[in-house]
Amino acid sequence: MEHELSGLFNVVHGAGLCALWGSWAAYVRPYHPKRFASFARQVMGIEEVNDDRCGTLGIQALVSFFKRVGMPVCITDLNVCIDEAIIQTMAQNCLLRSDSIGQLKRLSLQDIKAIYRKAGKVE
């Protein structure tokens, strides 16, 4: 997903990953709450018993870290404005070789578009 963003807008790869990560993680977390809770506890030092809440807190903690070190946390932070047409193009380009992408959760066209919308603050 980030390759499409950096390809269209000449965004540095790491910045693009940071801009998409929080939206992707929030979208995928409900499908793998234990995995995100493990990340939150082991990497971000979150001490929360409930896995769902812990995963959410871990995502928020990493996004806050990105902000503290001056990294973008959404597409608009990249000084990039996307609309539905751009979202559609990027999402379709993600699926040129397959009908879904991703390892943790296979993402369909609709999934990809939802993540881009959230990351781009497009309602």
Regions found by a protein language model. Give the residues of each.
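C-terminal charged capping/lid subdomain of soluble metabolic enzymes
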Residues: 36, 43-123
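Active-site segments that bind and position negatively charged phosphate/pyrophosphate groups
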Residues: 1-61
